[in-house]
């Protein structure tokens, strides 16, 4: 975040702020400081500079905060404790079907964990009078890796594009250098998460996938939009390629990642014994990726206009419900380690 401020000043895109207090607030603004979303100086400082008071949308703030807590406690932590952690700790003891469900489960776990934190941060910022852009946009409905990165951790992907990919030359220096720039950008994006081979492989998979997609588009030309069935096929293929990357992202090392992938060849005849919450989360979590955006906005808008007593009751009921449905204790957010 601070790097983008310095680079934007160097490029002449913004003027340095003359207020030390404004700069300190930009650098240390606590809601999104640890795990995003990454806020650009031009967006944050502009909100400090205006004299207009930002109306606080209580309904949207409650939706973001309570929704983020639900994603973390009920979705991410339940999937982790009841399915994902056990399989990734001992893949040799899991059936092929159980391993596949654990991989799917981790895809939903990391989405619930990370987007949940982003939603909470954006909601708290909104209560403090700051408006931040959404950081996730139903990423698993993407029909290509390029679209996935327009929907996943949007603030990071745009940061990598603007400050790494463009700085390397972007797509202005010919086809081969464009491929190189894509690959380097994603490799560095992987290393940003940690100096381990699992993150290198994760970044390389996404980089190679983006290169192949670009090569195919260049060979075929812009053409016409894919049919409905074509988009379904592309969406399924993209999701499974992303899941392959998540195996390396989640595994403690390359050997464990190989064991997880090898476990897919195990028995597929015996049904795994799953907690009912896991089954519901897998079904509902997958379905939610394709629901229309803003489906529940009218209800939250009504809540925002309701008396404080009504809002307090909803908050208490939601928290108690999450405590009942969630596991014992709350694990740290995944992105706190990066």
For the regions a protein language model found, what residue spans apply to each?
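Membrane-embedded transmembrane alpha-helical bundles that form the catalytic cores
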Residues: 2-337
